[in-house]
Amino acid sequence: YDIIDSKGNKNIHCYANCDGLVLSNGDILAVASCRANSGYRDLPEDAGIELRRSTDNGVTWSEPVKIYQGVNWEPFLLELPTGELHCYFTDSSRTGLEGHDTDTGTAMVVSADGGKTWSPDFSSSPYYVLRMRWEKNGIVGYNHQMPSVVRLNDNKGLAAAVETNNSGYHISLCYSDKDEWEYLAADQEGPADSNNCVFSGMGPYLGQFPSGETVLSYESSSKYTLKIGDATARNFGSAYQPFSGGYWGSLCMIDSHTLVGTNVKVKEGPVQMAQFVLNHRIDAVKREVTVDGNNKEWANTDHALFVGSKSQAQGTLR
C-alpha cells in the first residue's frame, strides 16, 4: 500500500518472506518482513517484521503488529517448551559494508508472553546470534543468513541451518547445547560450535522427527534437495531431489513419520508440493485377539506396513 516514507517521499509498503507457527496453545502466528519498496536499504525506519495472530485456526486474523524495526529478510519462528518464542531473521548490513559482496548475519528477538511483547525493544538493536566473519580484498564483513532453527530432541539444545554467501552460496550449521545462544557484538563471529560452508546450497530448512532423524532441505543447482541426518544434525546422508526445479522451498514436519516439502518455480509461478514418509524400523505391536472377524483389538494401533508395488499383489499389514 502507498506510504510517505521516513524521508518524506511517496513510496510503497511491501512484504516478503512469510513464516508461520502453530503455538502449543493452538494460536497461529504469522510473521513477514516488511519494507519501503524504493530505496529500502536507506530506510530502516520503514522496514521491520510484522506479526499477525489467529485464534480460530486461520479463519480470522488480528491486525498486524510490528515486533522489530530495521532492514531484514526471512523471519523464522521457534517455540521452546517453556513457551518462550524466538523470531530469527537475516539482519542486513550492521557493519556498514552494503555493496561490498555481502554483509549480513542472523539476529533474533524474543518473547516470553506468547508473542504479545518482544525484546529487545522495538527500535533497539536485536540480539546477534549467528555470524561468520569473511575477508575479501582487505574488506571484512559477516554472513550467515536465511536461518532455520530446531530444538533437538532429548534436551540436546539448538541446531541452526543457515545460508552463507562466501565465494558462492553454502549451507552452514550452528549449534548450542542449551536452549539459547550467546549474544554477540555486531562485529563478532559465533557461535564457536559451528560447521561453516559444509556444502553448496541455498535457503535451508531444518526439521526433526520424534524418532531422532533430522531432515535438511535446501536449493542446489536450482533443485529442491533433501538430506536425512542424525539426531544431532551434524552428519547427513545422500542428497535426494524430488522436484523438477525451482527456488526457495521449505519443509514442515506433519507427524511422527511425515513431512511436507514445497518448492516454487519462480519464473513459471506454480508451487510444487509433496508429502514424504520416513522409512525406518517399526516395532511390531503384540495383541491378544479373538478370531471373530472384528478388528477392535487393533483400534489403537497406528503403525502400518505396506507390502507390494504397482501390481495386483499388495497388502497392508498390522
Q: What feature does the model see in each segment?
A:
Residues R281-R318:
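Order/disorder boundary and secretion-linked terminal/linker segments
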Residues Y1-R281:
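Asp-box/BNR beta-propeller blade signature and adjacent active/binding-site loops
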